[in-house]
Amino acid sequence: MQYHDAMALINRLDSRDPGFKTALSQLLAFEAEQDESIDQAAAGILADVRRRGDAALLEYTQRFDRLAVDDATALEIPQADWHAALDSLPAAQRQALEAAAARVRAYHERQRGETWTYTEADGTMLGQQITALDRVGLYVPGGKAAYPSSVLMNAIPAKVAGVPELIMVTPTPDGVRNPIVLAAAAIAGVDRAFAIGGAQAVGALAYGTATVPAVDKIVGPGNAYVAAAKRRVFGTVGIDMIAGPSEILVICDGKTPADWIAMDLFSQAEHDELAQSILLCPDAAFLAEVEAAIERLLPGMPRADILRVSLANRGALILVRDLEEACAIANDIAPEHLEISTEQPQRWTALIRHAGAIFMGRYSSEALGDYCAGPNHVLPTSRTARFSSPLGVYDFQKRSSLIQVSREGAQTLGRIAAELALGEGLQAHAASAQYRLDQP
């Protein structure tokens, strides 16, 4: 078995090998390094923004983004500018954004929770009321790696949920705004946008300043400082998740073109050097074909340097006994993205319990899910799909319990509650229930 062989393009594992479980665990091991200096820097910035508000925001924006303005109100990007950005997009790009947005909206509209109630025989009504969050902050990274798809995936579910005010923050280094991000904000229904970024933007959204209103939840990806700041403000506000590196796991029966599978592995490996791309297949000859395809296609990729490191350190081609075993291994890995590139993918999907998104069949490339299929691309990473879910409408809605007890119901429930309260030594609880009992 090759594992972290300095010469290997990608690791080769075999599930029959006695050391397989250990090798797989090593391959999967990813500890998000909590860099103490980053955490301390974020904490200092948050405290400063909380204390000094707009003044701190202006200073940090000048220091980190080289953007100097006299007044914090100048950091707001007017809606007219977003619409101008939208109008200036090439027609094909605008059409692609609008088509993706329509699909994302159609999918998320099916997730909307509804208030429900039921009434018991004695007239007592119980239920659950669904309400949207009042105000949400959306962080969008700036600079070269601007992802308009991220705007659509975070903003549209919030608006479908009924969030009345959605505030986008995005850094504009040297004052340069990304027109496609602003265009996406216009399409997705964002309400306000500010040219701020980093831990200072997270602080402004969490605590509020004279210019930037405080929000109830902060969503969206960011760099290590943004992640550290989101971790620290959690509890004051809600957050979506702290995302780890991208992951793809492909289960293939050996009948999909090898080049397709190689490129699917590349699609995640190109994100960064810590991204993880793994193929599970029971056909050794096909694994060799995919390895040959990787070797052939890699030199032509613009991000070949990142791909090489990612595939050599965290990628793997794994020979399994059969597709049942592949599904069992997939459940253990709990991947962010899972492709089931087989005949009758439904059969194997039924065996999957833990995955962020499941791409079924040979034509369902993971890239389609990233951009325009409709389901959300904000997915649990680092094995957290064992207990968490994709971002969705439900992340922007809350549930309140409804309890309307009838006079008759109070007689039955009052006696039960009083008995339990006295058992816990809570006399006022008991009395509160007993006062409502009809006197004999």
UniProtKB/Swiss-Prot annotation:
Cofactor note (record): Binds 1 zinc ion per subunit.
Cofactors: Zn(2+)
Residue ranges crossing the lipid bilayer per the database entry: none
CC per GO annotation: cytosol
One Pfam family recorded for the sequence: Histidinol_dh
Binding site for substrate: 246, 268, 271, 337, 370, 424, 429
Lyase among keywords: no
Top enzyme category: oxidoreductase
Domain of life from the UniProt record: Bacteria
Biological pathway: Amino-acid biosynthesis; L-histidine biosynthesis; L-histidine from 5-phospho-alpha-D-ribose 1-diphosphate: step 9/9
Keywords, ordered alphabetically: Amino-acid biosynthesis, Histidine biosynthesis, Metal-binding, NAD, Oxidoreductase, Zinc
Gene Ontology BP term (one): L-histidine biosynthetic process
Catalytic reaction equation(s): L-histidinol + 2 NAD(+) + H2O = L-histidine + 2 NADH + 3 H(+)
InterPro entries in alphabetical order: Ald_DH/histidinol_DH, Histidinol_DH_CS, Histidinol_DH_monofunct, Hstdl_DH
Sites where the protein binds NAD(+): 139, 200, 223
Residues that coordinate or bind Zn(2+): 268, 271, 370, 429
UniProt-listed SUPFAM superfamilies: ALDH-like (SSF53720)
EC number: 1.1.1.23
Active site, UniProt feature: 336 (proton acceptor), 337 (proton acceptor)
UniProt GO MF annotations: histidinol dehydrogenase activity; NAD binding; zinc ion binding
Record family assignment: Belongs to the histidinol dehydrogenase family.
Functional note: Catalyzes the sequential NAD-dependent oxidations of L-histidinol to L-histidinaldehyde and then to L-histidine.
UniProt xrefs under NCBIfam families: hisD (TIGR00069)
Protein name (record): Histidinol dehydrogenase
Species whose genome carries this gene: Bordetella parapertussis (strain 12822 / ATCC BAA-587 / NCTC 13253)
Gene name, Swiss-Prot/TrEMBL: hisD
